[in-house]
């Protein structure tokens, strides 16, 4: 059975390059999702695995890293030591496990894979007085530079309604994964579901981004349970990742939905 380390390798191995678009809250307090505030033309993640249990993560053109670059080793023995990483087939990332009391930010990285494309959305909240306020969203349409044929770019939709329209009447499956340290965790067995656009449409903040990415999230984190919704419209399917927090604002589970589009 494929463990979390193997899912990580199967999902992320490659030389990923793309254009980073960042939407950052301005000094007037507004987060405008119509136009990025910062664009990094060549964000590049080279993720390699020389052996079955070790690898290297090497990134350049990074918006958040000091000097725009970072490098660190990868190892099965240390992977996911905190339980903050999650992997499904063709989707993976990492999350803050609770709304922190002292840390400077609350963040999530979500990646959706399709062939040799990787669509990444980053969500960041920062303290604003006694509240946590959405501070930045980053979107990157990565393509693997090792692929013989580069996956074509996807047009950005004009609205969330336009992006979600092809899903009307679709059915799919849902899997759940609960936080746990190490590599042994397994997602639940897939269960059938029907498409419901309301978690996106009813969110306080919703937007569409490059590569078919979409989100529906709160502007300010609630004092009790809440959900973060992120999705990606890919050729022939839509993937949705729900990040579910309980009333103590601790991460309860990740839910991955997949819908086939005729």
Report the location of each language-model feature.
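Soluble ligand-binding/transfer domains with enclosed cavities or grooves
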Residues: 2-13, 17-262
């Amino acid at each position: 059975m494929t463990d979390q380390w193997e899912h990580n390798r199967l999902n992320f191995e490659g030389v990923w390059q793309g254009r980073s678009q960042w939407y950052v809250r301005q000094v007037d307090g507004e987060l405008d999702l119509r136009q990025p505030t910062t664009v990094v033309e060549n964000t590049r993640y080279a993720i390699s695995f020389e052996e079955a249990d070790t690898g290297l993560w090497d990134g350049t053109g990074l918006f958040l890293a000091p000097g725009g670059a970072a490098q660190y080793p990868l190892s099965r023995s240390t992977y996911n030591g905190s339980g903050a990483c999650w992997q499904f087939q063709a989707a993976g990332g990492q999350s803050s496990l609770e709304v922190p009391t002292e840390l400077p930010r609350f963040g999530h990285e979500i990646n959706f894979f399709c062939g040799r494309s990787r669509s990444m959305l980053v969500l960041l909240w920062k303290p604003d007085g006694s509240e946590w306020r959405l501070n930045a969203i980053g979107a990157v349409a990565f393509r693997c530079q090792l692929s013989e044929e580069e996956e074509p770019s996807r047009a950005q939709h004009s609205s969330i309604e336009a992006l979600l329209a092809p899903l009307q009447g679709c059915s799919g499956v849902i899997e759940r994964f609960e936080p746990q340290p190490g590599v042994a965790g397994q997602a639940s067995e897939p269960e059938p579901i029907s498409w419901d656009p309301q978690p996106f449409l009813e969110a306080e903040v919703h937007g569409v981004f490059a590569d078919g990415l979409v989100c529906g999230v709160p502007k300010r984190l609630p004092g009790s349970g809440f959900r973060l919704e992120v999705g990606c419209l890919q050729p022939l399917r839509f993937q949705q990742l729900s990040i579910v927090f309980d009333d103590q604002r601790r991460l309860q589970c990740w839910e991955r939905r997949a819908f086939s589009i005729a």
